[in-house]
């Protein structure tokens, strides 16, 4: 497994990024990157587990030649409510989770808004650059019995990028 400098894409056994199957809660992710491939679309506050299969991956993942990255979202706390928020230099996040029906059904909502363009504007050659992106993950999870559960998972994200003419010197 290798990566490329200045990019979030990975290469497994020499393949390009299209040789990898990337899933989020069993749904295919076609572009796992934000902001010209510098940032991942996966908000770590919403992720429970990541499984990487480099070879001999299970048949249910067929259709790709290189690897499978299977990402599972957290299910939310089904016992009590939790809230958190962070404000950072290039990103801010919020997370809400709790029970809908205690012990049985839960929800999770995690959002992230990043503004790396604010940092780029400090550099003379990037003045006037506008770059931001957002992610929202939401999930409702319900345990039907000891062997079965049902869930509804949503991801929404977007990028906003504008490069003013680069200043040289």
What residues fall within each predicted segment?
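Short acidic, glycine/proline-rich loop/turn micro-motifs
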Residues: 33-36, 118-124, 163-166
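Residues that act as N-cap/strand-start positions at coil-to-secondary-structure junctions
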Residues: 4-6, 16, 79, 90, ...
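Short, solvent-exposed polar/charged micro-motifs at secondary-structure junctions
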Residues: 11-14, 94-95, 163
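Flexible loop and strand-edge segments within Gram-negative outer membrane beta-barrel domains
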Residues: 149-169
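A cross-taxa feature marking solvent-exposed loop/turn segments within ectodomains of secreted
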Residues: 3-5, 78, 102, 147
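Feature marks short, surface-exposed loop/turn motifs that line or immediately flank catalytic pockets
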Residues: 30, 115-117, 158-160
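Periplasmic N-terminal accessory/gating domains of Gram-negative outer-membrane beta-barrel systems
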Residues: 1-58, 68, 74-75
């Amino acid at each position: 497994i290798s990566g490329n400098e200045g990019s979030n894409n990975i290469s497994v056994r020499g393949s390009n990024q299209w040789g990898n199957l990337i899933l989020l809660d069993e749904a295919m992710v076609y572009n796992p990157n934000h902001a010209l491939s510098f940032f991942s679309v996966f908000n770590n506050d919403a992720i429970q587990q990541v499984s990487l299969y480099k070879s001999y991956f299970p048949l249910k993942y067929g259709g790709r030649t290189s690897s499978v990255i299977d990402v599972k979202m957290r299910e939310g706390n089904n016992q009590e409510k939790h809230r958190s928020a962070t404000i950072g230099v290039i990103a801010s996040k919020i997370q809400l989770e709790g029970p809908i029906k205690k012990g049985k059904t839960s929800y999770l909502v995690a959002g992230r808004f990043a503004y790396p363009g604010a940092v780029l504007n400090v550099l003379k050659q990037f003045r006037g650059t506008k770059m931001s992106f957002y992610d929202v993950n939401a999930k409702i999870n319900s345990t039907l019995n000891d062997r079965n559960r049902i869930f509804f998972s949503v991801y929404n994200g977007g990028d906003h990028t504008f490069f003013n003419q680069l200043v040289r010197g």
